[in-house]
Structure formats: C-alpha cells, structure tokens
Amino acid sequence: VTYRFRDLLALEPLSAAELTFLLDQSKSFQEIQRHPLKKLATLRGKTVALAFFETSTRTRISFGTAASRLGADTMNLQAEASSLKKGETLLDTAFNLNAMKPDCLVMRHAASGAPDYVARHLDIPVVNAGDGTHEHPSQGLLDALTIRDRKGTIENLNVTILGDLSHSRVARSNIHLLGKFGCRFTLCGPAMWVPRELEKIAPGTPIRSVYKIEEALED
C-alpha cells in the first residue's frame, strides 16, 4: 500500500488500506517508548516546523517529542509572540516559515480549512494538528491505534462518543476513520451539543444520536 497524499490534512479522504498503513507504521514506532535510549535516526537531518496558532499543550508537546525521538530537529512558532500580532497574514507567516527550509510543517489553527489553505501554497508536507471544528487527524489515528491495541481490532465495533460534539473535530475524525472499518456510532450529549447533521457526515456509516447516557450504553 502506498500513501497517495503529500500532506495529512484530514482522514475523510483516506482509504481503509491507507489508514491501516499509517496505523501499522505508528505501531512500529511504539517500541521506542520502551528503549533506554529513546532515539531513532529515521528523520535525522530533517527539520519539522511546529506552528500552533491555537492554544495546545498535549498535541504540541507530542509532535515535538515524536519529531525528536525520530531524530528530527524542530523549530517552534509561538503565535502569540509572532508577527501575526502586528497584522501579518497567515499566508505570509507560512511563506516566512517555508523560507527557513523546514522539511515538514505541523499546523494547528482555529479556522476550519486553514491547514489545507496553507498546504496549497507551500512545497513541503503539511500535517493538520487540528483545525476549527473540521478534523484532528493525528488524534483520530491515535484513538484508533489505542482501540486496536486494547481490543485487537477496529473492525465492526459499536462506538459511543459523548460530550460537546457540535464543536468536536476529534469526533469527526473518529467517525471518518472508524466508519471505514464497519464501526457503528452512537453520539450522546445534550441536544444542543449533538447536532443531527453529524449523522450524515459519513455516508454509509450507521450513526444515531441519543440524549441519555443510559441509551448510549445499551449496545
């Protein structure tokens, strides 16, 4: 299996085979965690730019740690201390980062579609670390890998997602990924947090909405 895309902007367009390829690659790197020396040479000589235009702790540190453990150097853009505060546009900021010749850009932004917009103007791979209410591909992959590790499979499972799903980019990535493996979804939360349009975001994937946790846990 080959990965068709230069970037990782969303899970929705990926096939089950491509998702399995990414999960298997991720699994192969888990062993690093158990090594006394947590370092590989996979990305030696490469530089990963981290541009988080929205507050992040776990995702930013996780990407930085992953890059370091795979041998890459990192450069960090602190949005609150950048020229964005002086009126520089997002695209100009991206061009300036690109001029420093990183090999990859990891980007989080509050606007849905911002990483895709930037990726169309740069000549390096862009990884979406969360954009608005659109998607959070890396978290979706991590969730699927965790489920596969614990359950032994991600196929044909009943999956319940609870909380404020109207704003959850993670829930959308979970649905797009796991739905390709025959999973069925129950979405649960107060009615204002579970918009019915979520039932239609992945055609062919069974999705139902309920508003009581007892109903959500029936299956």
Where do the protein language model's features map onto the residues?
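Positively charged, low-complexity intrinsically disordered leader regions
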Residues: V1-I61, T65
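A short acidic, often aromatic-flanked loop/helix-cap motif at beta-alpha or helix-coil junctions
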Residues: A16, T133-H136, E214-E218
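Short gly/ser/thr-rich secondary-structure transition/capping motifs
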Residues: S28-R34, G87, P203-Y211
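Phosphate/diphosphate ligand-binding glycine-rich loop within oxidoreductases
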Residues: L37-R148
